[in-house]
Regions:
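Terminal leader/tail segments of proteins
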Residues: 1-107
């Protein structure tokens, strides 16, 4: 296991099977290395700092597909055809579901 610290409250944990972003002790997103599918959980605070780190996590580690939604209504976005604006839009839409207005700094 390897751990990369993004800031004092956010870490990325690398294991044999997945790469996971944590905010404090809560899992935010997990990328499964075998199938390259990423699940984004609902169990986090959607703070601006966490959203920014999720954006950076997606941009750096998600190279194939991102899984959006809950079973049975799951959509897959193919990251080879997605640019940073699309990633930002995805995160913004998820945040707006939870009432977060200011989402990410422009990058």
């Amino acid at each position: 296991m390897k751990i990369k610290t993004l800031n004092p409250n956010h870490v990325v944990v690398f294991t044999e099977n997945n790469i996971t972003l944590f905010s404090y002790d809560t899992e935010v997103a997990s990328l499964f290395c075998d199938g390259m599918f990423l699940g984004v959980t609902d169990a986090w605070d959607y703070s601006n700092v966490t959203l920014k780190n999720l954006y950076l996590f997606l941009r750096e580690y998600c190279t194939d597909y991102i899984r959006v939604g809950k079973e049975p209504n799951v959509n897959l976005l193919h990251f080879n055809e997605v640019d940073n604006k699309a990633i930002k839009k995805f995160i913004t839409q998820r945040a707006e579901e939870y009432g977060v207005k200011k989402v990410l700094e422009n990058r």
